[in-house]
């Protein structure tokens, strides 16, 4: 990775346009003012500056992890047996994630059903032990005969917590204009969960922790942190939604601190949400619970990586636009990412991509974009090298695939075609 990264206005705006940089959006303020003002940040960092996100502490922080494999990395010479390694590693990673425990599948209710373009779309809801009820779309092709392979389709983050499942589904009803443009920008205009269902899958798209039906409501938090913002009215104007999303981006800092203080982590909580969704999917009468997979872009790619690494039920997984290394985040890219990524002490145990390999030899695919400014291209390639190395060492090199596509952060039609082919290879054989 280049050690002398350049921060400049063009680079920063490209981050912000992806909707990840949250607290660094120009003009973004929070109760009491935001000390991390984006405009000031840009003015203080010219195109010729050689800086990092934590100043004079950067060199020291970068040296802590170095290039050596983590203590539980399968790259270590001491690990040779895949089963023994992952049994030990999973116990430790579960401990670090500190996920809320949900002991049984909650009661699931069907609250709506539509048919659109050859796909049945049922709206489901269930109540977890924490937070508001979860809503999800369950999609199946019409005239199903026999049990189908099931895929957990994981929506992205996109700095848009007002929406979740609607980002990748079209249920045949009028779509909000923001969701139409979202699909056009990131998914070639496609509701890819629908496209996958058409190809013979049962697809579940759940709102995860803090998104759409699971979002934090302003009425439920103290006025001192509302920053004059109110919950979105039924008219759902773009202005109201964007205002809520700016507030929610800043609220991530509070949420992360509170979760750490409670003894859990943000990845641990969304993983618990998604594991329950996987249980719901596997319990449906239309689904073959022995053929389950997952796929997602960006924040959905992170979710795919986590549940694909931590849950043995996932037989095939695709991570799109969310693969790099911890080293990439230390100095240059942590500010472009959500708190959903970070687990204290995990980098000591293994590198970021190795989480995705925790269920080896289960097949895993990574899709990257060469102009994705959320990560350093060199570190995306290094993550690919790490995953190739561990799958090769385990004796299953054919069970891992990585592809690089031209262009910015996206999961476009060409990438969808490749992802769907990968899922078909492993879930329909």
Question: Predicted regions: what is each one?
Answer:
Residues 154-272, 330-331:
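Cap/lid segment of the alpha/beta-hydrolase catalytic domain
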Residues 339, 385-386, 390-429:
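C-terminal catalytic histidine-bearing segment of alpha/beta-hydrolase fold enzymes
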Residues 131-133, 142-150, 157:
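Proline/glycine-enriched tight loop/beta-turn segments at coil->beta junctions
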Residues 287-296:
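Alpha/beta-hydrolase fold nucleophile elbow
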Residues 61-139:
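Non-catalytic accessory segments flanking enzyme active sites
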Residues 249-264, 268-277, 315-356, 374-384, ...:
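Mobile cap/lid helix-loop segments that gate and shape the active-site cleft of serine hydrolases
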Residues 2-20:
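N-terminal secretory signal peptides and thylakoid transit peptides that target proteins
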Residues 5, 27-54:
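C-terminal segment of N-terminal export signals and the immediately downstream linker at the start
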């Amino acid at each position: 990775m280049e050690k002398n990264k350049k921060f400049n206005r063009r680079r920063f705006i490209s981050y912000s346009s992806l909707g990840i940089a949250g607290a660094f959006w120009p003009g973004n303020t929070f109760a009491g003012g935001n000390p991390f003002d984006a405009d000031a940040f840009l003015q203080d960092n010219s195109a010729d500056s050689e800086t990092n996100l934590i100043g004079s502490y950067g060199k020291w922080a970068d040296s802590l992890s170095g290039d050596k494999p983590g203590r539980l990395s399968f790259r270590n010479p001491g690990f040779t047996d895949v089963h023994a390694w992952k049994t030990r590693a999973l116990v430790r990673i579960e401990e670090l994630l500190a996920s809320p425990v949900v002991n049984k599948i909650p009661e699931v209710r069907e609250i709506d059903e539509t048919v659109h373009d050859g796909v049945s779309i049922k709206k489901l809801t269930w109540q977890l032990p924490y937070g508001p009820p979860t809503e999800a779309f369950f999609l199946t092709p019409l005239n199903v005969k026999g049990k189908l392979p099931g895929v957990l389709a994981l929506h992205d983050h996109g700095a848009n917590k007002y929406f979740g499942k609607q980002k990748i589904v079209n249920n045949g009803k009028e779509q909000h204009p923001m969701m139409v443009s979202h699909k056009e920008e990131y998914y070639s205009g496609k509701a890819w969960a629908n496209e996958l269902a058409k190809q013979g899958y049962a697809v579940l798209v759940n709102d995860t922790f803090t998104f759409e039906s699971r979002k934090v409501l302003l009425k439920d938090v103290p006025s001192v942190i509302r920053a004059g913002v109110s919950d979105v009215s039924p008219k759902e104007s773009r202005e109201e939604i964007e205002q809520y999303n700016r507030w929610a981006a800043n609220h991530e800092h509070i949420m992360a601190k509170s979760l750490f203080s409670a003894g859990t982590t943000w990845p641990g909580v969304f993983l618990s949400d998604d594991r329950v969704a996987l249980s719901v999917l596997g319990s449906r009468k239309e689904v073959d619970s022995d053929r389950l997979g997952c796929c997602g872009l960006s924040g959905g790619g992170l979710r795919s990586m986590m549940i694909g690494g931590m849950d043995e039920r996932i037989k095939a997984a695709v991570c799109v636009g969310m693969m790099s290394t911890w080293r990439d985040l230390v100095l240059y890219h942590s500010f472009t990412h959500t708190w959903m990524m970070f687990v204290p002490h995990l980098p000591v145990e293994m590198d970021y991509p190795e989480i995705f390999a925790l269920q080896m030899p289960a097949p895993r695919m990574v899709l990257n974009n060469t102009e994705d400014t959320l990560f350093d291209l060199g570190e995306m390639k290094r993550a690919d090298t790490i995953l190739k190395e561990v799958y090769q060492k385990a004796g299953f090199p054919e069970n891992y695939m990585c592809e690089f596509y031209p262009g910015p952060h996206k999961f476009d039609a060409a990438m969808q075609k490749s992802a769907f082919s990968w899922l078909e290879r492993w879930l329909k054989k």
